[in-house]
Amino acid sequence: MAPCPQPESCPAGSPLGLICLSLLLIPASAGTYCECSLGLSREALIALIVVLAGVSASCFCALVVVAIGVFRAKGDTCPGHSENRLVGPYGVQEDRIDLHTVHVESHLMDPDLDVSMMPSLDGPGLMTMTAPLEPPPPPPPPPPLPQ
């Protein structure tokens, strides 16, 4: 039979204590008896430990992803390493733009409607308007100060 801590020495609440408790529950699940109780059944404790292990694994994976991102960011700022990149107001941007022709075909378009039938925007129906620039009106006087 595996030795088990007394009820007053049970680690209540700490993740390390729950992991240690899970090591104590392994012999308990094999048919031995353990006096240590946190007010939860053995199945509930095992489920809690599984959930904590999953959360720990997720946090570890997130930490690895952040660490890789930091190492890559540090690698891009090496003074001897130069690439075709510009630092703009929205972060690092490529200095060349690759534009590809995109052909868009609409299935909602009327097949009888031809592009040549569309009126040109440069037609006689459109004219340019010029507006004279006027100086802005003076600002209103400030309100009198209360006395």
Curated annotation (Swiss-Prot):
Q: Where is the composition biased (Pro residues)?
A: 133-147
Q: Which domain of life is it from?
A: Eukaryota
Compartment(s):
Membrane; Cytoplasmic vesicle, Secretory vesicle, Acrosome
**Which residues does the entry place in the Cytoplasmic compartment?**
69-147
Which Pfam family, giving just one, matches this sequence?
Answer: TMEM210
Annotated stretches, region: Disordered: 128-147
As given in the record, the signal peptide range reads 1-31
Q: What is the first-listed, main subcellular location in coarse terms?
A: membrane
**Sequence ranges on the Extracellular membrane side:** 32-47
Transmembrane region(s): 48-68
**Keyword tags:** Cytoplasmic vesicle, Membrane, Signal, Transmembrane, Transmembrane helix
A single GO CC term for this protein reads: membrane
The protein's topology relative to the membrane is:
Single-pass type I membrane protein
Provide the protein name.
Transmembrane protein 210
Q: Which organism is it from?
A: Mus musculus
Taxonomic lineage is: Eukaryota, Metazoa, Chordata, Craniata, Vertebrata
